[in-house]
A protein has these predicted regions:
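Acidic, Ala/Val/Gly-enriched low-complexity intrinsically disordered segments
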Residues: 8-12, 25, 29-30
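Metal-dependent nuclease catalytic cores that hydrolyze phosphodiester bonds in DNA/RNA
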Residues: 26-31, 35-238
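Metal-dependent nuclease catalytic regions and adjoining charged, substrate-binding loops involved
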Residues: 35-46, 271-276, 281-402
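Short histidine-centered catalytic/ligand-binding loop motif
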Residues: 91-94, 261-273
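Hydrophobic/aromatic-lined pockets within catalytic cores
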Residues: 109-114, 253-256, 287-291
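Conserved catalytic cores of phosphodiester-cleaving nucleases, focusing on short active-site segments
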Residues: 238-265, 282
Length: 402
């Protein structure tokens, strides 16, 4: 990926081509799983975007549209039975520190320092409150000091202390006050913020990224571009992390399982997490977007027309001459999320065999999805069809049972 003049269009401060997004807000049938078929009945509180290229769509609205995104397509490729099981019996997704870290680096690199400060709050550290009462033992000791009974629970001890001592710092109250003041924000520890700022700084030092970044944030091109389209009667969507006139930037965080070089760990993460399939889904979406662009289906575009003109010119070149400097490239920016937050930047030609196979797999998943929906419907289990196997020595490596 090389920088070139005009790789990032200046914002023009006006409603772009197409005006406001065209969408229908309806209501979803309670308890019904996702159904991305165009023919699916619409009822109750469903957000459905019309086919088009959209700028500035809030993340929550994008995810509310039930079109199949890259994650769903990847799940359908790997195991459609498992996909439908997750739709019918969804578990409660916990927001782990790994997820928070990934969301935070996305926010910092794609939206900027101010957005990170607005959406994320830094948790107070107990080391900043050296005189605070933290444990039950601390509370009991202070109760003894002021001459009150602590009770059996923390809440009882705190209430007893507050009857006689209004000034002593109590850690539980500090945390409760902090959480009440930061409702709606994601809470991360101070160490995580330090790592994220370091990651953003190191990203910008990369010679391929430096020309399109400022203050640790992408400033050329457009972040979080949403594409909605229809294929084979199935509604599909994609949300590109960052789009340059000559490259698709996909930002990922990864955590190595073992101590190894960041470069090798990043490659393993791409393979293990099947990010190739996500890339295949995005490439399909961008090809569909070229047709939507030709039809004028672009909404809330704050950029000069030349920006998307250049994107789709580069895409057309990539289809015929992927090695050309003028061809659109795929760029993974992999950020190590444990230890030193090193960036690994990997550029891929869109014509690579890996991507061609990924696009073919996505094509197959769309066909399979429609067939399974027509056979079983959205509200029923999709029955497994694994034929009985005959296994032998060649089904395992010679070292499998050592």
């Amino acid at each position: 990926m090389t920088s070139r003049p005009g790789s990032g269009m200046a914002r023009v401060g006006r409603q772009g081509m197409g005006g406001c997004p065209l969408r229908q807000d309806h209501h979803h049938v309670e308890g019904s799983p996702m159904n991305a078929l165009v023919s699916a009945p619409i009822s109750n509180n469903v957000v459905r975007f019309e086919p088009g290229i959209y700028f500035g769509v809030p993340e929550a609205e994008y995810h509310a549209d039930q079109s199949l995104g890259s994650t769903s397509l990847k799940e359908l490729i790997i195991d459609p039975v498992e996909y439908q099981h997750d739709q019918l019996y969804p578990g409660v997704e916990k927001e782990t520190m790994a997820l928070k870290w990934g969301h935070a680096i996305h926010c910092r690199a794609l939206e900027g320092r101010l957005s990170l400060a607005e959406r994320f709050a830094i948790a107070p550290a107990v080391t900043d409150y050296k005189d605070a009462l933290v444990t039950m033992e601390h509370l009991r000791s202070h109760c003894k000091l002021v001459g009150v009974k602590p009770g059996k629970k923390k809440e009882e001890a705190i209430a007893a202390i507050r009857e006689f001592d209004k000034d002593v710092l109590i850690w539980d109250e500090i945390i409760a006050k902090f959480e009440a003041e930061n409702v709606g924000r994601t809470i991360i520890p101070r160490d995580a913020l330090h790592e994220i700022e370091m990651a953003a700084r190191w990203m910008q030092r990369d010679p391929k990224l430096a020309p399109v970044m400022r203050d640790g944030t992408f400033v050329a091109g457009a972040s979080e571009v949403s594409i909605f389209y229809v294929e084979n009667g199935v509604r599909l969507k994609a949300r590109i992390d960052h789009l340059l006139s000559h490259a698709i930037i996909d930002l990922k965080s990864f955590r190595p399982f073992f101590k190894e070089r960041a470069l090798e760990a990043a490659k393993k993460a791409v393979s293990r997490m099947r990010y190739d399939l996500q890339a295949g889904a995005y490439i399909k979406a961008l090809r569909a977007a070229a047709k939507l662009y030709a039809e004028g289906r672009v909404f809330n575009n704050p950029y000069d027309r030349e920006f998307l003109d250049s994107v789709f010119r580069a895409l057309a070149v990539a289809e015929t001459d992927a090695d050309s400097d003028d061809a659109l490239k795929w760029v993974w920016v992999m950020i190590k999320a444990s230890g030193a937050p090193q960036p690994v930047v990997g550029e891929f030609d869109l014509s690579s065999m890996i991507f061609k196979q990924a696009v073919a797999d996505v094509d197959g998943a769309i066909v399979a999805y429609r067939g399974l929906m027509e056979k079983y419907g959205p509200d029923n289990e999709w029955e497994p069809d694994i034929p009985a196997q005959k296994w032998g020595d060649t089904d395992w490596s010679p070292y499998a049972f050592i």
